Amino acid sequence: MTSPVAHRPIGGLNAFRILKQFGPLMFLLALMLVFAATNENFLSQLNLFNVARQISITGLIALGMTFVILTAGIDLSVGSLLAFCGMVAAIVAKGGAANTLSLSSNAGQGYGWFAALLAAVLVGTAAGLIQGLAITRLRVPPFVVTLGGLTIFRGLTLTLSGGGPISGFTPGMRWFGTGLVGPVPVPVIIFGAAAVLCHIVLRYTRFGRAVYAVGGNAEAARLSGVRVDRILVAVYMIVGFFSGLAAFVLSARLNSAEAVAGIGYELTVISAVVIGGTSLFGGIGGVGGTVVGAALIGVLVNGLVLNNVSSYTQQVVIGLILIAAVAFDRWLKLRAGT
C-alpha cells in the first residue's frame, strides 16, 4: 500500500507570484479605465502628454531610488535635492547670482542649457557622494543621514534663491521639458532611455549583481568579496545623479526653478518604487516594476485632480497605498516562508 504524497499548493503559490508580478500593472490598467469613464478629458492628448511628462520626472528619481532600496537603504532627501539642483541649474542657465535675477530678466543671458544640465547632475551626484560617505564611513543609518539632507538641501536652496523663483530660460533649455520628438514628449524619451540603461546595469552587469547581493545579505556579500561600502556609496551617487537630471527637466518644463519645488517628492518616489514590487527590505525588485509604479502614481494623482479631489486627500490616498504595498510585500514573504 502506498502512502499519499503531500503536495505543495502549487496553484495557490503561482497565483501569489502572478499577483505580485502583475498586480501593479493590473491596478494601473483598472485605474485608467475608471478615470476614462469618470472624466472625458482623461484620455485627451493634452492630458496624456501632461501625465507622461510628470511621470517621467518622478520616474527618473525613482530609477535612482530603486538602486538605493535594493540595498535596503532609503533616501529621504530627493525632494529637497531636486529643488537645490534645479536652482543651481537655473542660476547657471541665467548667469549670475540668484539675488540679481528677476522674473523679467532676459532669457538669452547665461551659460546655456548644457552648462545648466552639467551643473545639475554634478551637484546631485556630489550630494549623493557626501551622503553615501556619511553612511559608510560614519556608520550613520541612511534614514538619519538623508533626513538631515532633506533639511540641509532645502535650506541651501532657500539661501541660494532668497526664497524666490528664477524663470525665463532659453528655447533650447525649455525643449527638454516641453519639446516633442515626433509624437513623443522629450521627457518621456529621456526617462525611457534611462530606464533601459538602468535595467541593463542591474540585470546584466557585475555591479548590478552586487547591488542585489548587498540588499539580500550585506555580510554574506562582504565575505564573498563584494566591496559593500563602495556599492552603497555608488547607489547614493546614482540617485543623486537622477535627482539632478530630473531637476533640470522639471525646470525646463516649468520654465522656472522654485525654492519650494519637490516638497513631498520623497513619499511619491518611494511609493512608486515599492508599489512596483521592490522590497524595502532589499534584494528584490527591478526597473520594470518601478516604471509601472511611477505610472500608477502619476495616473492616480492626475485622475484624482480631474475628479476634483483635494491635494490633501491625494496625499492620504498615496500614503495608504504605500502602507498597503509594504504590508503586501511582507505578507508574501511570510507566505513563501522566507
List where the protein language model places each region:
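Transmembrane helix-bundle core of multi-pass membrane transporters
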Residues: F114, L138, P142-T205, I231-A234, ...
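Alpha-helical transmembrane segments within multi-pass membrane transporters and channels
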Residues: A97-G149, V292-G293, I297
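Cytosolic-side transmembrane-helix boundaries in multi-pass membrane proteins
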Residues: M1-L33, A37, V196, L223, ...
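Single transmembrane alpha-helix segments in multi-pass membrane proteins
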Residues: A30-N99, L133-V140, G277-G288, L320
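Membrane-interfacial amphipathic/re-entrant helices at transmembrane-helix boundaries
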Residues: T2-A62, A97-A115, V226
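Hydrophobic core segments of alpha-helical transmembrane domains in multi-pass membrane transport
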Residues: P24-A37, M65-T66, V121-G124, L150-G155, ...
